[in-house]
Amino acid sequence: MDWIEREKKHILQTYTRQKVVIERGEGCYVYDVNGKRYLDLVAGIATVSIGHCNSHLVERLKEQLEKLIHISNLYYTTPQVELAEKLSEIAGMDRFFFCNSGAEAVEAALKFARRATGRKKFVSFTGDFHGRTMGALSVTHKEKFRKPFEPLVSPVEFAEFNNPESLEKVVDEETAAVIVELVQGEAGVYPADREFVKAIEELREKYGFLLIVDEVQTGFGRTGRWFAKDHYGIEPDMITMAKAMGSGVPIGCCALKEEVAEKIQVGDHGSTFGGNPLACTAALATIEVIEREGLVENSARMGEYFVKRLKESFENVIGVGLMIGFDVGDAAEFVRKCLENGLLVNNTSERRIRLVPPLVITEREVDKAVEIMLN
């Protein structure tokens, strides 16, 4: 019995997997159990930001494994404090709640919004994806994700993405928070217009709701800036982050401004594993590599080059840093053929391809990827 048959026998079938068993990775490449090499433009869905098995990350994790893996938030640990201080520097936020994933970060943000405002209602947008747990799912728009699990958290209303007039119709004095992806990832890579973001800011001023920016997919250099919010010059009340934060080691975070944080009390939320020493060390090491190797700048530079190359042959190419989407005739077939030819890509719909490679990708690897796609 092979690995795929064994998986089907024992693992809950919640994923549509490509027919390849990945065994190891290095940089922008992964290798299957037969030794075949693949250029990886998925990176664990925008997660393996500094490349597979980065040597600095591995060494830092080894050191921490020999010291302390886990204790509890009943006690203080140094990596957690160091990480919070570093995040304050790069994200411009004041307080941090650590958890294990993007969905958990969103759940925390929703709870904190209700606690801080005393209001109940949330507003999200068409095309937004915030996670699959019950709260995060409640502010996720796509019906196929939501319908089987209703009733969800309420009240929640959806406005049309990039439509200020639509938003104005649904926000009011009862709105606790507006949550938004400034670059929609699961929808296929669609950035928010500047006028739309300005409208959100003006309505926040008028009604006093909190602004939650979901940076789970866009954070840590993915868009060519540390965070997508940096493109717009805005100051959210909360930011959710995860994915690339630990470059493959599970860690998430809800970052808060002091005005929100001061209204959260001891016992309002918690996490057994959140902020454990190993995960925080992974995040610190990831940030160290991003800074040392100039990966935020590389994301902007390589993203621009990748988009230029793709526009020569594909339709509706949109890119923000190394978060890129484009259209093909049959996306599932395109993914399958790329896989056969040693290239990992991802489709978000019947026609839309999403590329979110490691931030260490080079011009040579971009050229190789485009060559495979065209062939």
Curated annotation (Swiss-Prot):
Note on how the cofactor is bound: Binds 1 pyridoxal phosphate per subunit.
The keyword Amino-acid biosynthesis belongs to this UniProt entry's keyword annotation: yes
Subcellular location: Cytoplasm
Binding positions (pyridoxal 5'-phosphate): G102, A103, F129, D214, E215, V216, Q217, T272
Top-rank lineage group of the source organism: Archaea
Subunit structure: Homodimer.
Name the UniProt record assigns to this protein: Acetylornithine aminotransferase
Gene: argD
